[in-house]
A protein has these predicted regions:
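Tandem repeat scaffolds
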Residues: 23-174
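Bacterial N-terminal signal peptides
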Residues: 10-19
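Bacterial N-terminal signal peptides that target proteins for export
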Residues: 2-10
């Protein structure tokens, strides 16, 4: 009788854990909220404008020259992904983790990157014009020739680990 009860408890716990874990998707499944597309390679040049991808795992993915304009990707993991020459115009990346990702020549114009973690990311020639990077982590990021014109950098952790001051619009004033 005890063994039967234990099996029921184990089954109930396994069922509960399967319901609480993020959805694991095949790389060709439609993009959606909370899914795991880690290590997928998507076609170059796709138009994913307006995608709804909050809480999703896009780590180690490849999205070259992809349009994510006006997409909702808050609380998502884009770490170690490849996104060169992509566009995130007015995208919501609030509190997303983007550690070590490649965003070379990527357009973040008007994007919400509040509290985003971009530590160690490649942001060479990235465009952050009028983007909100308040509280973002840019420690050890490569910002060569990046454009921050009009960007809100208040409270951001700059590449050297120092916090940007309250007048940091367009550049980090420590």
């Amino acid at each position: 009788m005890l063994a039967f009860r234990m099996r029921k408890v184990i089954f109930a716990i396994a069922l509960l854990l399967s319901l609480l874990s993020p959805a694991h998707s095949a790389c060709d499944d439609p993009l959606a909220d909370g899914v795991d597309y880690s290590k997928c390679r998507f076609s170059d040049g796709q138009d994913l404008q307006g995608s709804f991808l909050p809480n999703s795992n896009l780590s180690f993915t490849s999205f070259i020259q992809v349009n994510f304009d006006k997409s909702i990707m808050m609380n998502s993991n884009l770490s170690f992904g490849t996104f060169p020459e992509s566009t995130f115009y007015r995208a919501n990346l609030y509190e997303s983790v983007m550690i070590g990702a490649n965003f070379e020549k990527t357009n973040f114009t008007g994007a919400n990157l509040t509290n985003a973690d971009l530590m160690g990311s490649t942001l060479i020639e990235a465009n952050f014009q009028n983007a909100n990077l308040m509280g973002a982590n840019l420690i050890s990021a490569n910002l060569i020739n990046a454009n921050f014109e009009g960007a809100n950098l208040i409270g951001a952790n700059w590449t050297d680990g120092e916090k940007c001051g309250p007048q940091s619009i367009g550049d980090c004033k420590k």
